[in-house]
Each structure stands twice: as C-alpha cells, then as structure tokens.
C-alpha cells in the first residue's frame, strides 16, 4: 500500500475518525432505500459487549451538532461510553464512505423508566467532533419547538427489520407515517400510559413502521427532529402506532445538557 495512504490512515485512527465497514441487521418496515444525501442527520450507534469483542450496530441516532447525537435512552442506559462508536455519513452498513467518532459521554434522561418507557431520550457526546464541514453526507438537524399536529406526515429513517423478526438490508431505509392523536394511541396501549413525553405515529391499517434495530433513530417533520424511535407493539401492526420520544417536550432538557459540554 502506498506510504502516503498508510500515513493518512494512521493519522485518522489517532484522531478517532476513520472509514468503517459495517454489518447488516435489518431495515424500516414498508419503506424504501434512501441516500445519506437526503438523510444527512442520521447516524448509526455501534456497540461492543466487551473490550475484546467487535462493534455491532445496535441503534440509530440523529446529529444535533458536531459533538451531540440524540438517541433513545434505552439504547445507552447502564452502558459504558467507551464501548460505543458513532458512524456518520454513510447510508450503507457495508460501505466504506462513512466516518466513525468515539463516544466520550452518554447522557440518558435521569428520569428514564424502562418499565413505562417514559423519558426515553438520551444524548451521546462524541470526541473528536464530527467533521460536518468536510462531508456532504453529514449535517445537523434542528429540533422541533412544538409537537406536530395530528395527521401531519412524518419521516422515519433507520436500519431496523423489514418486519417482525424479518429480513435485513444493508441500505438505509425511509418511510412516511402520519402523526396519531395521543388519545387514540392511549386507547391502543391501554396497559401503558402515553405521557406528554411521547408522540405516536403510524397507519391504522399498519404496514409501515419502525422496527427492531431502528430504536434511537429520528422521526422528522418539516425538516425538524420531532421524535425519537422508542417502542411499540410488534412492528407495523394494524391499530398499533409506533411510539416516539416527543422531542419538543424535551427541548429544555436538551439545551440544559448541552451547556455542560458544548
């Protein structure tokens, strides 16, 4: 290999930024292939179970700024930052066009409840910062200031399963679903409270949804981050919308956390 290339790779490794090749694990239900040029804010969270094991994609995330990734609390709760990497700028798990940054801090919401799934939001702090100005496939997204209206179309992106326990895809997927009334969502999930910190989206007939592997990924409305993939009953089942962390509800919490490290 050319000595110049070797030197460049060595420098990138020391900086904590390097090309990545990832493995396939699934995709959005009812969606279609999309490009990182249209989903520049989407990242992969990769985790290893121990210092001697390899990294594997576990959740999605969303770029808020060069050092801040928004994701679901259940993706990072009781985990160590040193066991995570963030893959950005690549829509394919098997590609070599993305970059990786190491994680320096995990900030799950202090009131996250794994039983009720309330406050299922977290921030992931990366170091070094993502080189947003150097890549046309990476870009931060603005946070929604208000909860989206019922019926508005929202876009979900991720690498989760195509169906419950279904097939997988190397390519990032995207699908549109309408925002669902919280009262109707509560009727569907009568056994678990739909709190103010939750947002529901999906089709009454089912067929389109996030699924396993999409957790932590973004739900976007009008080019703003409105929700974070959290939980649901199966995947794309009729009358069971997906449930998301309501980002607008947590905007003050996000701002407060960012002041501690930005």
Swiss-Prot record:
UniProt-listed GO biological process terms = proteolysis
SUPFAM superfamilies from the xrefs? Trypsin-like serine proteases (SSF50494)
User: Among its keywords, does the record have Mitochondrion?
Assistant: no
Q: Which GO terms describe its molecular function?
A: serine hydrolase activity; serine-type endopeptidase activity
State the CDD domains in the record.
Tryp_SPc (cd00190)
The protein's superkingdom reads: Eukaryota
Give disulfide pairs as residue numbers. Answer: 59-75, 185-200, 211-235
Q: Which Pfam families match?
A: Trypsin
In its UniProt entry, what is this protein called? Trypsin eta
> Species name for this entry?
Drosophila melanogaster
């Amino acid at each position: 290999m050319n000595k110049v290339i070797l030197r460049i790779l060595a420098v990138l490794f020391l900086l904590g930024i390097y090309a990545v090749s990832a493995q396939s694990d699934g995709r959005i239900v009812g969606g279609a292939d999309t490009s990182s040029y249209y989903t520049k804010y989407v990242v992969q969270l990769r985790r290893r179970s121990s210092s001697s094991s390899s990294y594997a994609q576990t959740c999605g995330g969303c770029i808020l700024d060069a050092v801040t990734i928004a994701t679901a609390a259940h993706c990072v709760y009781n985990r160590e930052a040193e066991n995570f990497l963030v893959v950005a700028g690549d829509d394919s798990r098997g590609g070599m066009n993305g970059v990786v940054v190491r994680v320096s801090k995990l900030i799950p919401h202090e009131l996250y409840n794994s039983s009720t799934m309330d406050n299922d939001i977290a921030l992931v702090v990366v170091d070094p910062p993502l080189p947003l100005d150097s890549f046309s496939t990476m870009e931060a997204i603005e946070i929604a200031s208000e909860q989206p209206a019922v019926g508005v179309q929202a876009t979900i992106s991720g690498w989760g399963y195509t169906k419950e326990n279904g097939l997988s895809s190397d390519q990032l997927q995207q699908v549109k679903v309408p925002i669902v009334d919280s009262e109707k969502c509560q009727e569907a999930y009568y056994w678990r409270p739909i709190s103010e910190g939750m947002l529901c989206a999906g089709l009454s007939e089912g067929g389109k949804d996030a699924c396993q592997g999409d957790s932590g990924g973004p739900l976007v409305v009008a080019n703003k981050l409105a929700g974070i993939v959290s939980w649901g009953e199966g995947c794309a089942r009729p009358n069971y919308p997906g449930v998301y962390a309501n980002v607008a509800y947590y905007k003050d919490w996000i701002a407060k956390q960012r002041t501690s490290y930005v």
